[in-house]
Amino acid sequence: CGTIRIVCEADATIDAASTVPAQSATRAAAKPAGEDFALRITGEDFDRTWETVAAYNAEDTSYSFPEGRYTITITYGDPEAEGVDKPYYAGSTEVEVAARRTCTAQITAKIGNSQALVRATESFKKYYNNAEFSVTTGAGNVFTFRPCDATEAESVWVQAGKPLTVKGTARGQSQDGMSEGPLYTFTPEPLEAARPATRHIFTLDARKAGSATLTVTLGEG
């Protein structure tokens, strides 16, 4: 029999192709410590899980494995959970256990879910106000954004590989400056499937009063 040493870390990279710094409201994902990952080790006639890598390390001096090939999988978070501060990480590797030897499983877990955000340009805010938009996920959750507010909302985590639909309303300029302006309803904008480790930004823009567009940007573009 031999032993397995687990060395793991989290890669919090999102929008890897983007070169534009993230705004403060779209801060980096929470990065778990290596020992906080849930652990699963599988092999021929072997399948066992540990609540954390720390729990495994606490007993690894006495835990040995028959010779053979094993798959080491680490996860953190819930892949089906959606909302603020709900990143999901996953990673795996394979090792060969030899008799009376310790092999090292080096694993980097990457983000497996996606982010969504609705924001408005300064040009849009010049012509519209009281905007309220909702992002509906493939899982059926609905998240509300008010992109004309002074403080931009945080991105929400959503399931990767599932559709996103954005729709909403905004008030146009008042003719007399006193009463409410006309209410505009925006046609739902669908996204077929959210990409893993990507921030999907739905941006409202307007070049003149009564004219507005809703575009989707992958990354911080």
For each feature predicted by the language model, list its residue ranges.
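Extracytoplasmic cysteine-anchoring/structural motifs
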Residues: 1-44, 48, 55-58, 64-99, ...
